[in-house]
């Protein structure tokens, strides 16, 4: 069976979906904190995007690759999509670049 979800570092609080099966309600199993856990996607998640594997509280760091990639702007529950609607990047907003807005 091919792996559809990756957690890149044990400190991460997100997983990366590498499957076209990112529909709301899809279930994935992976080892988190040494235990096999099942996650149900709370919404459709595109290939290559992230979802939470632990609760992430507003203001908490979002961790991928073992490093902070941003700060949660809202509470994020396990299985929820983690993207620009609920995280402020540590590196700026590439989607705003070139629009006369602060990146």
Predicted regions and their residues:
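N-terminal small-residue-enriched
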Residues: 2-103
